[in-house]
Regions:
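Short amphipathic alpha-helices within nucleic acid-binding modules
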Residues: 20, 83-89
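Helix N-cap motif at beta-to-alpha junctions
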Residues: 13-14, 81-84
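Vicinal oxygen chelate
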Residues: 31-34, 46, 78, 87-130
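Generic beta-structure capping elements
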Residues: 50, 58-61, 127
């Protein structure tokens, strides 16, 4: 038997990333420095959501490298209680939806896509049924 534990993405600004994911309903759990040979290589920031055991791990590397997003990454999907309210909170941070919320099929949930502060594409799915 296997369990899905976490998703890790690299970040460049922990404060902006924390504000973004907290606006989506995630809860900051803890941070942890990764130290090798006396040097701090990275800091991991862990977030949980709902009652799930799965966590989101945001990693800030301290080596000064820049990262290419590449074209293999798709998106992370997150269900939110109220899409309009969530988008309003994100707008306060300067985050806009790529396009207006829409339904994939008639009677289906509304959804839209946004980008987090590092450009990762996030799908937001409305649980409210609006």
């Amino acid at each position: 038997m296997a369990d899905f534990l976490h998703t890790m993405v690299r970040i460049t600004d922990p404060e902006k990333s924390r504000a973004f994911y907290e606006a989506l309903g995630f809860t900051f759990s803890r941070d942890m420095d990764i130290v090798r040979n006396g040097e701090r290589e990275a800091t991991n920031y862990f977030f949980s959501v709902g009652g799930s055991e799965n966590v989101l791990e945001l990693t800030l590397n301290h080596d000064g490298r820049t990262y290419d997003m590449g074209d293999a990454y798709g998106h992370i999907a997150i269900a939110v209680d109220d899409l309009d309210e969530t988008l309003s909170r994100l707008k306060e941070q300067g985050i806009e939806a790529e396009r207006e919320p829409y339904r994939v099929r008639e009677g289906g949930s509304r959804l839209c896509f946004v980008r987090d502060p590092d450009g990762y594409r996030i799908e937001l799915i409305d649980r409210s049924g609006k």
